[in-house]
């Protein structure tokens, strides 16, 4: 499982600055679900070799009562989800009563907590940090989040202990799925090699994550799938967050369901309260090959559904959408829901949408057709010759635009990765291509390769001009000839 890091501290100590630096974005997934606070932010982070999830908790105010309230409502929940806590303080402002109260709480928890003194740029860092030792924390790091100073060393120290654990968990998952994790993925394939690799991948179990907001029917759908197949269920705990991996077989195809809601026994299917864990959901997305988002037709698509889809899209996962509780809706309501889905899901127009009833089983069987289609699309290997040929066909049908009097020239294309498919196109002035033409190329590849259910990423690389930045050095005879010509020009002017 991907490690989880929680940022805790009072307001204005730089938690959001560090969060934005780690996630490289200001557009985080905000938890706005029933039972969760509105100001906890979750983001994907990558620094060096480390991939992790970071949680930015809101600030904790200075009064003792406020600390108790805020910690109970928000920060303790984030700490409970986290593997390690970064307790941030302001090196310029110095030690405060709120810092002392937070430290007292952190000393009582049984999780690694590291003191991070921020804003030490331009000042004597050791002198500014000295008073914070009285908080009684075992470890202290000095950083300047705004400029990135010390952040890499901090993350290395925090996450290196989890590397061995992650390797062990990855080995367990590989044993379950019979999947090998090659050190370096092969990108260049002949057409024969591509076909052989495609067949190998189709023999591996598909890792399918069922995600969605609380009470949309995830547990009902999971039990419907398992009940229909009469599969013997066993649990393989991932971490303390207890995502459950459930091997199953359907239509001679093996799957591993990643269940974020927890498999309920039949007698407990009618539970109305379902605990929702953002971290568990994000980790399930990271682990999956295909993500199945369950939406409640009676509530329509929500901003939280869009956030989950956005996270899956950014992770490059294949996507299938199941609109649950479709039975019993009137014709007019169904038409309205379909229009809303068309309007709001334009950014994932490649995803198949199914209208189902998990309770009665209507439409559930067809979900797996789309899951297999999406997995095939994401894992199909395509040779350089095929990708280049499709690119030539696209440019013949619709030429690239002119840029400053010169037409953009696309030379060749090759694979840059799989799951999701990445296509690298080389050419001249390709950074000048407008977004509309990039979308045209992406859609052309999608149609030509019959790719459905997975995002496609196209990367452009400028072909280097070998003479750029070089001067043409003349030979001795050329220099003598140039002098004679210059002399002749001067004599004529006289």
UniProtKB/Swiss-Prot annotation:
PROSITE patterns linked: G_ENGA
Pfam families in UniProt: KH_dom-like, MMR_HSR1
Record domain EngA-type G: where: 3-166, 206-379
InterPro entries: AAA+_ATPase, G_ENGA, GTP-bd, GTPase_Der, KH_dom-like, KH_dom-like_a/b, P-loop_NTPase, Small_GTP-bd
The entry's keywords: GTP-binding, Nucleotide-binding, Repeat, Ribosome biogenesis
Binding site for GTP 2: 212-219, 259-263, 324-327
Top-level taxon of the source organism: Bacteria
Domain KH-like, chain residue ranges per copy: 380-464
Sequence positions that bind GTP 1: 9-16, 56-60, 118-121
Subunit and interaction comment: Associates with the 50S ribosomal subunit.
HAMAP family reported in the protein's UniProt record: GTPase_Der (MF_00195)
Name used for this protein in its record: GTPase Der
This protein's encoding gene: der
